[in-house]
Amino acid sequence: MRQPPDGEGSVQVEMDPALHIETAKVFAIYGKGGIGKSTTSSNLSAAFSKLGKRVVQIGCDPKHDSTFTLTKRLVPTVIDVLQAVHFHTEELRVEDFVYEGYNGVMCVEAGGPPAGTGCGGYVVGQTVKLLKEHHILEDADVVVFDVLGDVVCGGFATPLQHAERALVVAANDFDSIFAANRIAAAIQAKAKNYDVRLGGIIANRSVATDQIERFNARSGMRTLAHFPDLDVIRRSRLCKSTLFEMEPSPELAAVQQEYLRLAEALWEGVEPLTATPLIDREIFDLLGFD
């Protein structure tokens, strides 16, 4: 009996080797639900585009709201358009599922199966297959996967099979760090069989990062960027805008520069991490819980 790729007991959606993304730098962004992954992903994509890179952002959440600050609307999902043509992919055109957003960022929403049915990994796989068939990924410099919540099951871990670096968005609180630790463990498991490696933590919605840094020191993780809890960031979502389109202010300029700095660092290449995720009890003890 063949051993599952990620160890005994795992249930995985395995990648077709033909779907490997050869030329672009690929990043998968994870984090606790509601932590601001879509805001982070969209502004990071915008920052890459500001550096002159050709960017594709793929939303991997049934809510399909990953790219709406880039496109100013909720675009149809890949699963929606596939259902409309009864899964006859030859009937689809690029413009049916790829939408140009802010500063030329190409936006795709994979969507997901109805609640309680199907597999999100299948949908992500079909999305990548369509993009490959229509040569969208061949023309990209950067691909950003924005992945559902902190779900790292075999299905929603599928983007890790394509990614070069996995990034974790976290706030300076227990729940975020607990989720980040679990995600790091899942990424380490994938790294045994795929090219993906941990890149680090993006601190978000946090005045300070002291708890994140305590976790980093213990686990071997690192903070790549820090975005404070600013009202302008919240308002940008309400305005359906990236941070690069908001009314100028000194605090906004600082956040924009941090996104540009992060994009440049990721493009130049961040060293892979070999972190040591903590057991659950250690997280409680580390952050001061009895």
From Swiss-Prot:
Cofactor binding mode and count: Binds 1 [4Fe-4S] cluster per dimer.
One GO biological process term: light-independent bacteriochlorophyll biosynthetic process
Binding site residues for [4Fe-4S] cluster: 119, 153
Cofactor: [4Fe-4S] cluster
Keywords attached to this entry: 4Fe-4S, ATP-binding, Bacteriochlorophyll biosynthesis, Chlorophyll biosynthesis, Iron, Iron-sulfur, Magnesium, Metal-binding, Nucleotide-binding, Oxidoreductase, Photosynthesis
An example molecular function term from Gene Ontology annotations: 4 iron, 4 sulfur cluster binding
Catalytic activity: chlorophyllide a + oxidized 2[4Fe-4S]-[ferredoxin] + 2 ADP + 2 phosphate = protochlorophyllide a + reduced 2[4Fe-4S]-[ferredoxin] + 2 ATP + 2 H2O
Binding site for Mg(2+): 38
PROSITE patterns found in the cross-reference section: NIFH_FRXC_1, NIFH_FRXC_2, NIFH_FRXC_3
UniProt keyword Cytoplasm, yes or no: no
Functional note: Component of the dark-operative protochlorophyllide reductase (DPOR) that uses Mg-ATP and reduced ferredoxin to reduce ring D of protochlorophyllide (Pchlide) to form chlorophyllide a (Chlide). This reaction is light-independent. The L component serves as a unique electron donor to the NB-component of the complex, and binds Mg-ATP.
Entry-linked NCBIfam families: DPOR_bchL
Official protein name in the record: Light-independent protochlorophyllide reductase iron-sulfur ATP-binding protein
Annotated source species: Rhodospirillum rubrum
Gene, per the UniProt record: bchL
